[in-house]
Amino acid sequence: TLERRWGLKIKARGIYRDAVRSSQSHFVKCSGLRWVCLMLLSPISWANKIWALPFLTVLAPSKRYHEKQGKKHKALSDWARQICYLLHRWLPDFQLIIVGDGAYSVLELLAATRNYVTWITRFRIDAALYDFPPSEKRARPGRPPSNGKKQIALWQRLYCPLTKWQEVTFSHWYDEQNKSMEIASGIALWYRSGKPPVPIRWVLIRDPKGKLDPIPLQCTDLSLSPIQIVQHYLKRWQVEVTFEEVRAHLGVETQRQWSDLSILRTTPALMALFSVITLWADTLNSWQKLTVFQTAWYFKPYPTFSDAVASVRYRI
Protein backbone atom coordinates (compact mmCIF):
# COMPACT_ATOMS: atom_id res chain seq x y z
CA THR A 1 0.00 0.00 0.00
CA LEU A 2 0.97 3.64 -0.37
CA GLU A 3 1.33 5.83 2.71
CA ARG A 4 0.94 9.40 1.47
CA ARG A 5 3.75 11.46 3.00
CA TRP A 6 5.52 14.68 2.06
CA GLY A 7 8.79 16.07 3.38
CA LEU A 8 12.31 16.62 2.15
CA LYS A 9 13.78 14.72 5.11
CA ILE A 10 11.80 11.55 4.40
CA LYS A 11 14.50 9.78 2.42
CA ALA A 12 12.72 6.58 1.36
CA ARG A 13 9.68 8.27 -0.17
CA GLY A 14 9.02 8.21 -3.90
CA ILE A 15 6.53 9.34 -6.52
CA TYR A 16 4.02 6.61 -7.33
CA ARG A 17 0.73 6.17 -9.13
CA ASP A 18 -2.21 6.83 -6.81
CA ALA A 19 -4.47 3.83 -7.42
CA VAL A 20 -7.40 5.43 -5.56
CA ARG A 21 -7.48 8.70 -7.50
CA SER A 22 -6.34 7.37 -10.88
CA SER A 23 -8.44 5.77 -13.59
CA GLN A 24 -7.82 4.20 -16.98
CA SER A 25 -7.91 7.62 -18.66
CA HIS A 26 -6.56 9.79 -15.82
CA PHE A 27 -3.13 9.31 -14.20
CA VAL A 28 -2.56 10.82 -10.73
CA LYS A 29 0.86 10.81 -9.06
CA CYS A 30 1.39 10.93 -5.32
CA SER A 31 4.36 11.27 -2.97
CA GLY A 32 4.65 8.70 -0.24
CA LEU A 33 6.14 5.54 1.22
CA ARG A 34 5.41 2.13 -0.26
CA TRP A 35 4.79 -0.73 2.16
CA VAL A 36 4.47 -4.46 1.55
CA CYS A 37 2.00 -5.76 4.12
CA LEU A 38 1.24 -9.43 4.74
CA MET A 39 -2.14 -10.12 6.35
CA LEU A 40 -4.03 -13.15 7.59
CA LEU A 41 -7.53 -13.45 6.13
CA SER A 42 -9.45 -14.79 9.11
CA PRO A 43 -13.21 -15.12 9.73
CA ILE A 44 -14.38 -13.02 12.70
CA SER A 45 -17.52 -14.65 14.10
CA TRP A 46 -18.86 -11.65 16.04
CA ALA A 47 -18.41 -9.37 13.00
CA ASN A 48 -19.86 -11.96 10.58
CA LYS A 49 -17.09 -11.12 8.11
CA ILE A 50 -13.58 -12.01 7.07
CA TRP A 51 -11.01 -9.50 8.32
CA ALA A 52 -7.47 -9.00 7.07
CA LEU A 53 -5.13 -9.00 10.09
CA PRO A 54 -1.64 -7.54 9.42
CA PHE A 55 1.32 -9.38 10.94
CA LEU A 56 4.30 -8.40 8.76
CA THR A 57 4.91 -4.98 7.20
CA VAL A 58 8.05 -4.14 5.22
CA LEU A 59 9.13 -0.81 3.73
CA ALA A 60 9.98 -0.90 0.01
CA PRO A 61 12.06 2.26 -0.60
CA SER A 62 11.98 4.06 -3.92
CA LYS A 63 14.52 3.60 -6.70
CA ARG A 64 15.81 7.13 -6.17
CA TYR A 65 16.58 6.33 -2.53
CA HIS A 66 18.66 3.28 -3.45
CA GLU A 67 20.53 5.25 -6.12
CA LYS A 68 21.48 7.92 -3.59
CA GLN A 69 22.61 5.22 -1.15
CA GLY A 70 24.67 3.51 -3.85
CA LYS A 71 22.72 0.27 -3.48
CA LYS A 72 21.05 -2.03 -5.95
CA HIS A 73 17.34 -1.31 -6.18
CA LYS A 74 14.98 -3.99 -4.88
CA ALA A 75 11.71 -4.04 -6.74
CA LEU A 76 8.37 -4.86 -5.15
CA SER A 77 8.61 -8.43 -6.42
CA ASP A 78 12.03 -8.84 -4.77
CA TRP A 79 10.61 -7.85 -1.39
CA ALA A 80 7.67 -10.20 -1.93
CA ARG A 81 10.01 -13.09 -2.76
CA GLN A 82 12.03 -12.48 0.41
CA ILE A 83 8.84 -12.35 2.49
CA CYS A 84 7.67 -15.66 0.99
CA TYR A 85 10.93 -17.35 1.98
CA LEU A 86 10.60 -15.96 5.52
CA LEU A 87 6.97 -17.08 5.79
CA HIS A 88 7.85 -20.58 4.60
CA ARG A 89 10.63 -20.73 7.19
CA TRP A 90 8.18 -19.78 9.93
CA LEU A 91 5.45 -22.17 8.77
CA PRO A 92 7.11 -25.02 6.86
CA ASP A 93 4.21 -27.47 7.31
CA PHE A 94 1.37 -25.17 6.26
CA GLN A 95 -0.23 -24.82 2.85
CA LEU A 96 0.14 -21.10 2.21
CA ILE A 97 -2.07 -19.24 -0.26
CA ILE A 98 -1.18 -15.61 -0.99
CA VAL A 99 -3.73 -13.40 -2.73
CA GLY A 100 -2.41 -10.21 -4.34
CA ASP A 101 -3.13 -7.62 -6.97
CA GLY A 102 -1.55 -7.30 -10.38
CA ALA A 103 1.69 -5.86 -8.97
CA TYR A 104 2.66 -9.37 -7.84
CA SER A 105 1.87 -11.04 -11.15
CA VAL A 106 5.57 -11.22 -12.02
CA LEU A 107 6.96 -14.25 -13.82
CA GLU A 108 10.26 -14.30 -11.91
CA LEU A 109 8.45 -14.06 -8.55
CA LEU A 110 6.04 -16.90 -9.31
CA ALA A 111 8.84 -19.11 -10.62
CA ALA A 112 11.00 -18.56 -7.52
CA THR A 113 8.28 -19.16 -4.92
CA ARG A 114 5.76 -21.58 -6.43
CA ASN A 115 7.29 -24.52 -4.52
CA TYR A 116 6.67 -22.74 -1.20
CA VAL A 117 3.40 -20.83 -1.60
CA THR A 118 0.39 -20.69 -3.89
CA TRP A 119 -0.13 -17.37 -5.64
CA ILE A 120 -3.54 -16.05 -6.72
CA THR A 121 -3.24 -12.68 -8.43
CA ARG A 122 -4.83 -10.53 -11.04
CA PHE A 123 -3.30 -11.47 -14.38
CA ARG A 124 -2.21 -9.77 -17.57
CA ILE A 125 -4.88 -10.14 -20.21
CA ASP A 126 -2.19 -10.07 -22.93
CA ALA A 127 0.19 -12.57 -21.30
CA ALA A 128 1.97 -15.06 -23.55
CA LEU A 129 0.54 -18.50 -22.73
CA TYR A 130 1.72 -21.81 -24.19
CA ASP A 131 0.83 -25.48 -24.13
CA PHE A 132 2.98 -27.87 -22.13
CA PRO A 133 5.93 -29.33 -24.07
CA PRO A 134 5.43 -32.78 -25.59
CA SER A 135 6.44 -35.60 -23.26
CA GLU A 136 7.70 -38.03 -25.89
CA LYS A 137 11.42 -38.24 -26.56
CA ARG A 138 12.68 -36.73 -29.78
CA ALA A 139 15.49 -38.13 -31.87
CA ARG A 140 16.97 -34.77 -32.81
CA PRO A 141 19.84 -33.45 -30.67
CA GLY A 142 19.69 -30.37 -28.47
CA ARG A 143 17.98 -29.41 -25.27
CA PRO A 144 14.32 -30.37 -24.87
CA PRO A 145 11.73 -27.68 -25.58
CA SER A 146 10.55 -25.69 -22.57
CA ASN A 147 7.12 -24.93 -23.99
CA GLY A 148 4.68 -26.16 -26.55
CA LYS A 149 2.38 -24.44 -29.03
CA LYS A 150 1.32 -20.90 -28.24
CA GLN A 151 -2.26 -20.45 -27.05
CA ILE A 152 -4.51 -17.58 -27.95
CA ALA A 153 -4.39 -14.60 -25.59
CA LEU A 154 -6.97 -14.15 -22.86
CA TRP A 155 -8.41 -11.04 -24.47
CA GLN A 156 -9.06 -13.12 -27.59
CA ARG A 157 -10.84 -15.78 -25.54
CA LEU A 158 -13.36 -13.14 -24.44
CA TYR A 159 -14.68 -12.97 -28.00
CA CYS A 160 -13.90 -16.52 -29.16
CA PRO A 161 -17.09 -18.57 -29.75
CA LEU A 162 -15.23 -21.74 -28.69
CA THR A 163 -14.68 -20.48 -25.13
CA LYS A 164 -16.82 -22.42 -22.67
CA TRP A 165 -18.41 -20.13 -20.07
CA GLN A 166 -19.98 -21.25 -16.82
CA GLU A 167 -22.43 -19.02 -14.95
CA VAL A 168 -21.79 -18.99 -11.20
CA THR A 169 -23.57 -17.05 -8.45
CA PHE A 170 -21.15 -15.77 -5.80
CA SER A 171 -22.73 -15.07 -2.41
CA HIS A 172 -20.06 -12.64 -1.19
CA TRP A 173 -19.32 -10.24 -4.01
CA TYR A 174 -17.72 -6.87 -3.30
CA ASP A 175 -20.99 -5.32 -2.10
CA GLU A 176 -21.81 -8.38 0.06
CA GLN A 177 -24.64 -9.27 -2.32
CA ASN A 178 -25.27 -12.24 -4.58
CA LYS A 179 -23.71 -11.69 -7.98
CA SER A 180 -24.00 -13.89 -11.06
CA MET A 181 -20.86 -13.94 -13.20
CA GLU A 182 -19.58 -16.05 -16.06
CA ILE A 183 -16.19 -17.73 -15.69
CA ALA A 184 -13.91 -19.64 -18.03
CA SER A 185 -10.72 -21.44 -17.08
CA GLY A 186 -7.81 -23.37 -18.47
CA ILE A 187 -4.25 -24.57 -17.81
CA ALA A 188 -1.23 -23.14 -19.57
CA LEU A 189 2.46 -22.33 -19.30
CA TRP A 190 3.30 -18.69 -18.75
CA TYR A 191 6.59 -18.24 -20.56
CA ARG A 192 8.90 -15.53 -21.80
CA SER A 193 12.19 -16.02 -23.60
CA GLY A 194 15.04 -16.37 -21.13
CA LYS A 195 12.71 -16.84 -18.15
CA PRO A 196 11.67 -20.09 -16.44
CA PRO A 197 8.17 -21.23 -17.47
CA VAL A 198 5.49 -21.33 -14.79
CA PRO A 199 2.43 -23.63 -15.04
CA ILE A 200 -0.71 -21.72 -14.08
CA ARG A 201 -4.46 -22.03 -14.10
CA TRP A 202 -5.99 -18.92 -15.63
CA VAL A 203 -9.53 -17.78 -14.91
CA LEU A 204 -11.55 -15.24 -16.88
CA ILE A 205 -14.47 -13.49 -15.19
CA ARG A 206 -17.01 -11.47 -17.13
CA ASP A 207 -20.31 -9.82 -16.31
CA PRO A 208 -23.19 -11.32 -18.34
CA LYS A 209 -24.87 -7.89 -18.24
CA GLY A 210 -21.73 -6.19 -19.57
CA LYS A 211 -21.57 -3.56 -16.79
CA LEU A 212 -18.22 -4.65 -15.30
CA ASP A 213 -14.86 -5.00 -17.01
CA PRO A 214 -13.51 -8.54 -17.49
CA ILE A 215 -11.19 -9.75 -14.72
CA PRO A 216 -8.31 -12.15 -15.55
CA LEU A 217 -6.81 -14.17 -12.69
CA GLN A 218 -4.03 -16.71 -12.36
CA CYS A 219 -3.24 -19.38 -9.79
CA THR A 220 -0.04 -21.40 -9.44
CA ASP A 221 -1.89 -24.36 -7.87
CA LEU A 222 -3.41 -26.32 -10.74
CA SER A 223 -5.52 -28.45 -8.38
CA LEU A 224 -7.71 -25.53 -7.24
CA SER A 225 -11.01 -25.20 -9.06
CA PRO A 226 -11.92 -21.95 -10.85
CA ILE A 227 -14.67 -21.24 -8.31
CA GLN A 228 -12.23 -21.65 -5.41
CA ILE A 229 -9.77 -19.28 -7.09
CA VAL A 230 -12.42 -16.59 -7.52
CA GLN A 231 -13.65 -17.04 -3.95
CA HIS A 232 -10.10 -16.63 -2.62
CA TYR A 233 -9.55 -13.53 -4.75
CA LEU A 234 -12.75 -11.88 -3.54
CA LYS A 235 -11.38 -11.99 0.01
CA ARG A 236 -8.55 -9.68 -1.05
CA TRP A 237 -10.89 -6.70 -0.80
CA GLN A 238 -10.67 -6.98 2.99
CA VAL A 239 -7.04 -5.91 2.68
CA GLU A 240 -8.19 -2.57 1.28
CA VAL A 241 -10.73 -2.31 4.10
CA THR A 242 -7.95 -2.77 6.67
CA PHE A 243 -5.87 -0.04 5.05
CA GLU A 244 -8.82 2.35 5.29
CA GLU A 245 -9.53 1.38 8.91
CA VAL A 246 -5.97 2.04 10.09
CA ARG A 247 -6.04 5.41 8.34
CA ALA A 248 -9.36 6.35 9.93
CA HIS A 249 -8.88 5.04 13.48
CA LEU A 250 -5.18 4.37 14.16
CA GLY A 251 -3.52 7.46 12.72
CA VAL A 252 -1.66 6.06 9.72
CA GLU A 253 -0.62 8.90 7.35
CA THR A 254 -0.89 11.43 10.19
CA GLN A 255 2.52 10.75 11.78
CA ARG A 256 4.95 13.66 11.88
CA GLN A 257 8.22 11.77 12.33
CA TRP A 258 10.84 11.92 9.59
CA SER A 259 13.89 9.97 10.84
CA ASP A 260 14.64 6.66 9.17
CA LEU A 261 14.26 4.46 12.26
CA SER A 262 11.02 6.06 13.42
CA ILE A 263 9.47 5.55 9.98
CA LEU A 264 10.58 1.91 9.93
CA ARG A 265 8.99 1.31 13.35
CA THR A 266 5.84 3.42 13.56
CA THR A 267 3.80 2.32 10.55
CA PRO A 268 4.43 -1.45 11.06
CA ALA A 269 3.49 -1.00 14.73
CA LEU A 270 0.23 0.74 13.79
CA MET A 271 -0.59 -1.98 11.27
CA ALA A 272 0.08 -4.67 13.87
CA LEU A 273 -2.07 -2.74 16.36
CA PHE A 274 -5.08 -3.51 14.15
CA SER A 275 -4.55 -7.23 14.77
CA VAL A 276 -3.89 -6.73 18.48
CA ILE A 277 -7.11 -4.73 18.92
CA THR A 278 -9.03 -7.43 17.06
CA LEU A 279 -7.65 -10.13 19.38
CA TRP A 280 -8.49 -8.05 22.45
CA ALA A 281 -12.00 -7.42 21.15
CA ASP A 282 -12.44 -11.13 20.50
CA THR A 283 -11.51 -11.85 24.13
CA LEU A 284 -13.90 -9.16 25.38
CA ASN A 285 -16.68 -10.55 23.20
CA SER A 286 -16.22 -13.98 24.81
CA TRP A 287 -17.00 -12.36 28.18
CA GLN A 288 -19.74 -10.02 27.02
CA LYS A 289 -21.05 -9.14 23.58
CA LEU A 290 -19.53 -6.01 22.10
CA THR A 291 -21.68 -2.89 22.02
CA VAL A 292 -22.74 -1.85 18.52
CA PHE A 293 -22.79 1.93 18.29
CA GLN A 294 -25.55 3.06 15.93
CA THR A 295 -26.09 6.25 13.96
CA ALA A 296 -29.28 7.92 12.78
CA TRP A 297 -28.55 7.33 9.10
CA TYR A 298 -27.07 3.82 9.12
CA PHE A 299 -28.00 0.57 10.90
CA LYS A 300 -25.20 -1.83 11.79
CA PRO A 301 -26.30 -5.39 12.58
CA TYR A 302 -22.79 -6.46 13.68
CA PRO A 303 -19.83 -4.75 15.40
CA THR A 304 -17.25 -3.07 13.20
CA PHE A 305 -13.64 -2.13 13.89
CA SER A 306 -14.68 1.22 15.35
CA ASP A 307 -16.82 -0.65 17.89
CA ALA A 308 -13.87 -2.91 18.69
CA VAL A 309 -11.63 0.12 19.26
CA ALA A 310 -14.25 1.74 21.52
CA SER A 311 -14.67 -1.44 23.59
CA VAL A 312 -10.92 -1.88 24.05
CA ARG A 313 -10.47 1.78 25.00
CA TYR A 314 -13.25 1.50 27.57
CA ARG A 315 -11.62 -1.54 29.18
CA ILE A 316 -8.19 0.09 29.21
Predicted feature descriptions by range:
Residues 1-51, 57, 171, 185-190:
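Active-site-proximal, Lys/Arg-enriched surface segment
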Residues 5-10, 49-316:
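Single, function-defining residue in the core of a domain
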